[in-house]
Amino acid sequence: QLGSLELALDQSDVFGSCDIGFSCQYTSTISWRDSYTPLPMETNPRAVFERLFGDTGTTDPAVRLQRIRKDRSLLDSVTERVSELNRTVGAGDRAKLDQYLDAVRDVERRIQMAEAQSNRELPQIEQPAGIPNTYEEHAKLMFDMQVLAYQTDLTRVITFMLGRELSGRTYAEIGVPDSHHPTSHHRDDPALYEKVTKINEFHTSLFAYYLDKLDATPDGNGSLLDNILMLYGAGMSDSNRHQNTGLPLVLLGGAGGAVKGGRHLRYTEGTPISNLHLTMLEKMGIPMESIANSTGRLNLLSGV
């Protein structure tokens, strides 16, 4: 089982400083290991498939088990050679090797889990060829990969970025030959406002496709949507003014009955978004004292 998947639709191809002295890394990923370590986001559905099922090109159990055993054999060879090397190097190099061995053991643990799950009946799906030609096809294929990952319990945590900040992607397929960022600074121009609204509605319609897939996929006594907890939104409440407070966010899924939906909740001005993150973790059985700049939990979130 993978600890998490970080996925996106736009390549990260910008470097340096992007906005008011902040690193472009903040535009390229929305998932971080810690305050200083960004997690790279995968954009190729083929690579996502390989990460989930290996490079066999199929979800067939027999083929997957054969590949798993080959991987285990290679890993055993690597571990043996590193252990021999560890006995001959100095303290500094030994520390580096120990760090490497920790990573190897993590891979070994994943192989063991894969072996245990190799007979599980999986949906018959062939490996994607690569990135589709249109944004819509790309988004839907990446959503399909996410449903498959949850359905097979190969991960329980996914971060997905529909669009990179400052991306130059245009949306000709919906009649908008402009990119999202310049149209979001619409300056109350009706033509630009119409364009950015079209893009936002397009993104939301694709997200609705994902929700329908989750709702149609059985999981336990309900569906994946009943048991998932997902946050959908953006980093600006008014992009025209670069206003990043009072964010309009949507929380979806039932978290196994821990969260009641169908409501519009408004919180006190200045409430950190990390309070929401902290509460979401708690609802999914991961209690923490704090996260980032959190000041507490959102007590109104339950309502069940």
Where do the PLM segments sit?
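Ligand-binding pockets and gating/stacking loops
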Residues: Q1-V304
